[in-house]
Amino acid sequence: MAASSAKKWWKNAIIYQIYPRTFCDSNGDNIGDIPGIISKLHYLKELGVDVIALGPIFPSPRRDSGYDTSDFKAIDPDLGTMEDLDRLISRAKRVGIKVMMDMCIASTSDEHEWFKKALEGDEKYKNYYYISAYKRNNWHGLRSRSAWNKAENGQWYLSIMGKNQPDLNWSNPDVYEDMADAMRFWLDKGIAGFRLDTMNIIYKNSMADGGFNIFVKGGEHYLYTQGCRDIIKRLNQDVWSKYKCFVIGEGTSIFPDDSKHFCEDGLDAIFFCGRIDSGSKKVQKLQARRNNKKLIKLVDKGQHTLETPINYVESGDSTTYAKYFGNDKQNCLNFSKVYTGMHLALVGIPFINDGEYCRDPKVEDDPTSLYSFTSKMIEFRKNSKALSEGVYHRVAAPYDVLIFTREAKEERLYIYCNFTPAPRQVEFYGDRIVFSTYDIGSLEPFFLKPYEFRIIASNI
């Protein structure tokens, strides 16, 4: 793994995802920036955050939210300077917070200097990409009917993620060395690790036509290839293990079984995000009912399959579930607490997505806010051996209620999650209620309240 078993500092970390452009604006230009993040370090520390995960900070034309990178060794001038980043890393370190960053390694922007030189005919950089006088196969793009796009000079280039994101040719040793060098550049500055975006499509094992594929035509030639696994292993050996950094993989159409293989190859953890489908207002109730069942199934599978799941906690204003509530802000808040509590109680690393509620200074003083709930739950998790070290077991429950235990040494906790707006009759275990989204004195003996998250402790 990227960090040796004795040095896995990230095992019990609380990670907070920040999208710099929308987090905090320090200079009044309506664009969040790195100095703005520095100004909020006290807030992040009080929340209980151990690691900041920065969204894209590289220069980019922003045709894909900044993941279309035009320089892997520079800072987007809208977000600040290299000195600002150095200051963020230094000041975060003072308060016990590490900084990691997103890095899209499958492609570049079509405005990257490498790609410009490639189209100009520079043979070295032409081999950094898949450039041809014609479409070499019938592959579909992940967002288009064809993975091939035509440049102004009449040449075709492979761009699976989109027209403006030409794929890098990782079978070229020069590409490997330049990308490994870019990682070393940031690690030498004190970056604690990376979230590698679209890492599972970096290696193409063939340029042959694609047949039927459950995800996308041609996917059998670039999704989860052995070559991709070999590159991950090599990056771990050459770079990550030497810095004891934390590396998370992210990619399209990743499921728990695939995640397990990538972690065996050198990643420390991988995003397994079971996304919830949205629907029209007419089917929202049906969708919500179906999705609660789906969510519980996905969570349970991830807990059994992955050694270190990433428990992605979407904010109350960004989660797809919020669509079901419309203007019903109270129920949206109540559900968000259950959803957040569940993720903070599961085995794995909580990855909290920045949301509007976290940028409002009023929420820090509101005991009913999601901020307050999250802060208390993080503190509870950090002080509980069962939640920080314990094993997971699911307990039988109604289809839209999740009950599971976390157990370590002399402590067993029963965690109850009611994802519905109605009371649910369940069998309660344990000796004493230690945490709830409701006032403990108001709880009923045989029912979970609507959208209730509850923890009951039991001495073993």
Describe each model-derived feature in a short phrase.
Residues A2-R184, D188, I201-S259:
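Acidic/aromatic-lined carbohydrate-recognition and catalytic surfaces
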Residues R62-G66, S259-C263, T405-R406, F446:
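Short glycine-biased active-site loop of nucleotidyltransferases that positions the nucleotide triphosphate
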Residues G96, D110-L142, I232, N236-Y357, ...:
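Conserved alpha/beta catalytic core and glycan-binding cleft of carbohydrate-active enzymes
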Residues P166-N172, Y176, E220-Y222, Y321-N334, ...:
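Active-site rim elements
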Residues W186-L196:
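Active-site regions of oxyanion-processing enzymes, predominantly non-cytosolic
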Residues M1-A53, P59, D86, R91-A92, ...:
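Carbohydrate-interacting/catalytic domains
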Residues K11, G227, T305, C332-S336, ...:
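Secondary-structure capping and boundary motifs in well-ordered enzyme cores
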Residues P20, M103, T198, G251, ...:
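Residues immediately flanking
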